[in-house]
């Protein structure tokens, strides 16, 4: 079994974050990642489509984190950006937005689902996430920057969502949600922190490696792709 490849699928660069994508990419590669997704919030996109850096042995994926409180408008944004993005994330935070994201198979990840006194998920939404293949994002930055009762609440929400994810087989994605280079953590630090937060070792590995790779495979299908689960093999690929 080869060494796992790790991916951070939510990194914010200027003008959303503090650092340029080149700086974030260089440091992420140094920390041990195989790739990151540049996922600026949709209300803080650069005026021009950014040129993604080319780094040997490392890939920068084009992503976005959609911010929209109106479910109908959110679906419109998904349609607008889906074809041009490797990774499409929705910034949750209300039952209506969470539902709209989790019921849409064109969405890859739902980040920040919690709101008011809710963890953001329930049995119905967890089932929808599993059926539509929408992953729940576990974002490190809010946890690392929180203290006291706020952190306790966030950990409680995470525990509740983990239980639902396990029960309904909902995919999870671990990501830094970095707004600067100072928010980045190595894969080993991320895995260790995830386990402290309640994830099992295999769950954390899947969330930082297996699930991100599945997302890219889904959104960048090969030439023999028909639909999910069906692929036409030709020639030597059959054997």
Curated annotation (Swiss-Prot):
A single Gene Ontology CC term: cytoplasm
Alphabetical list of Pfam families matching this protein: RNase_P_p30
Gene3D superfamilies, alphabetized: Metal-dependent hydrolases (3.20.20.140)
Highest taxon of the lineage: Archaea
Keyword flag NADP: no
Keyword Cell cycle among record annotations: no
Keywords: Cytoplasm, Endonuclease, Hydrolase, Nuclease, tRNA processing
BP terms from Gene Ontology: tRNA 5'-leader removal
EC number: 3.1.26.5
Catalytic activity: Endonucleolytic cleavage of RNA, removing 5'-extranucleotides from tRNA precursor
Compartments it resides in: Cytoplasm
Protein family: Belongs to the eukaryotic/archaeal RNase P protein component 3 family.
Quaternary data: Consists of a catalytic RNA component and at least 4-5 protein subunits.
Function: Part of ribonuclease P, a protein complex that generates mature tRNA molecules by cleaving their 5'-ends.
Stated name of the protein: Ribonuclease P protein component 3
Species name: Methanosarcina mazei (strain ATCC BAA-159 / DSM 3647 / Goe1 / Go1 / JCM 11833 / OCM 88)
């Amino acid at each position: 079994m080869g060494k796992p490849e790790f991916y951070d699928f939510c990194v914010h660069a200027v003008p959303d974050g503090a650092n340029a994508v080149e700086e974030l990419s260089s440091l992420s590669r140094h920390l041990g990642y195989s790739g990151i997704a540049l996922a600026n919030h949709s209300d803080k996109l650069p005026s021009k489509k950014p040129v993604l850096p080319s780094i040997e042995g490392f890939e920068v994926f084009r992503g976005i984190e959609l911010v929209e409180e109106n479910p109908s408008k959110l679906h419109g944004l998904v349609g607008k950006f889906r074809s041009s993005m490797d990774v499409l994330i929705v910034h949750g935070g209300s039952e209506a937005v969470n539902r709209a994201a989790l019921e849409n198979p064109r969405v890859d990840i739902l980040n920040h689902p919690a709101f008011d006194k809710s963890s953001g998920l329930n049995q119905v939404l967890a089932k929808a996430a599993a059926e539509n293949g929408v992953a729940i994002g576990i974002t490190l930055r809010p946890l690392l920057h929180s203290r006291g009762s706020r952190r306790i609440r966030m950990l409680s929400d995470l525990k509740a969502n983990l239980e639902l994810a396990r029960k309904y087989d909902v995919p999870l994605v671990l990501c830094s949600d970095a707004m600067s280079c100072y928010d980045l953590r190595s894969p080993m630090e991320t895995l260790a922190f995830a386990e402290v937060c309640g994830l099992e070792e295999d769950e954390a590995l899947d969330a930082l490696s297996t699930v991100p790779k599945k997302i890219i495979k889904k959104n960048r299908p090969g030439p023999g792709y028909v639909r999910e689960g069906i692929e036409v093999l030709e020639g030597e690929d059959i054997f």
